[in-house]
Curated annotation (Swiss-Prot):
InterPro entries xrefs: Class_I_gatase-like (IPR029062), PRibForGlyAmidine_synth_PurQ (IPR010075)
Function statement: Part of the phosphoribosylformylglycinamidine synthase complex involved in the purines biosynthetic pathway. Catalyzes the ATP-dependent conversion of formylglycinamide ribonucleotide (FGAR) and glutamine to yield formylglycinamidine ribonucleotide (FGAM) and glutamate. The FGAM synthase complex is composed of three subunits. PurQ produces an ammonia molecule by converting glutamine to glutamate. PurL transfers the ammonia molecule to FGAR to form FGAM in an ATP-dependent manner.
Any one Pfam family match given in the protein's UniProt record, by short name: GATase_5
Location of this chain's protein in the cell: Cytoplasm
Keyword Translocase: no
Gene: purQ
Name assigned to this protein: Phosphoribosylformylglycinamidine synthase subunit PurQ
Length: 224
């Protein structure tokens, strides 16, 4: 399985993600510059965290217009896998690949912490390596991570089983319905505010995030 990690001006988690896919999982991985327009060789595109374009105007608002994003949209429309982490989640909502939006944290402060999450569904490529209802711990680091959607959209997301992760216990940012991560209706696009790549190597204090990536590989092996 070949991974591509998109690099925008201001991205700062791209190498963390590549370390997981290339070094921990041994998968071919290439860094995709924001001006690239050929990603046909990739199976999974990951938009990492950071501050793309300095978060000017609105988080992810400028990044969505980068040349590579049109290719990412087409990649997703073909049913291929796309993962947006933190700022990447914001970019995916701006690009219309995921519903809702990410607004300023309820307390208006930047949050950097480790938080418990409940795995809401394992009927997904992204979460199949977890157990239903499993509580995992992942780092968060964001100032605009409060998931918001209008009532109709929120109901649709819930009814379709698109919520894959919820904050367990205290809601750190005021996200509606404690939402921490959602997928699109097809299930091939995932956006999440917590950072699984920062909890993949036990040396860093936890490996709960590694299963997110391992599940994809297990699916490929099963289909082989």
């Amino acid at each position: 399985m070949k991974f591509g990690v998109v690099v925008f001006p201001g991205s700062n988690c791209d190498r963390d993600v590549a370390y997981v896919t290339r070094d921990l999982l041994g998968q071919p991985t290439r860094m995709v510059w924001h001006q690239d327009t050929d990603i046909a060789d990739l199976d999974v595109v990951i938009i990492p965290g950071g501050f793309s374009y300095g978060d000017y105007l609105r988080c992810g608002a400028i990044a969505r217009f980068s040349p590579v994003m049109q290719q990412v949209v087409e990649h997703a429309q073909k049913g291929k896998l796309v993962l947006g982490i933190c700022n990447g989640f914001q970019v995916l909502t701006e690009a219309g690949l995921l519903p809702g939006a990410l607004a300023r944290n309820q307390d208006l402060h930047f949050i950097c912490d480790r938080v418990p999450l409940t795995v809401e569904s394992t009927n997904s490529l992204w979460t199949q390596a977890y157990n239903p209802g499993e509580v995992i711990t992942l780092p968060i680091a964001h100032g605009e991570g409060r998931f918001y959607a209008d009532e109709a959209t929120l109901s649709e997301i819930e009814d379709n089983g698109q919520v894959l992760f919820r904050y367990a216990g205290e809601n750190p940012n005021g996200s509606l319905n404690n939402i921490a991560g959602i997928c699109d209706r097809q299930g091939n696009v995932l956006g999440m505010m917590p950072h699984p790549e920062r909890a993949s190597d036990p040396v860093l204090g936890g490996s709960d995030g590694l299963k997110l990536f391992q599940g994809l590989l297990e699916k490929v092996v099963a289909l082989a």
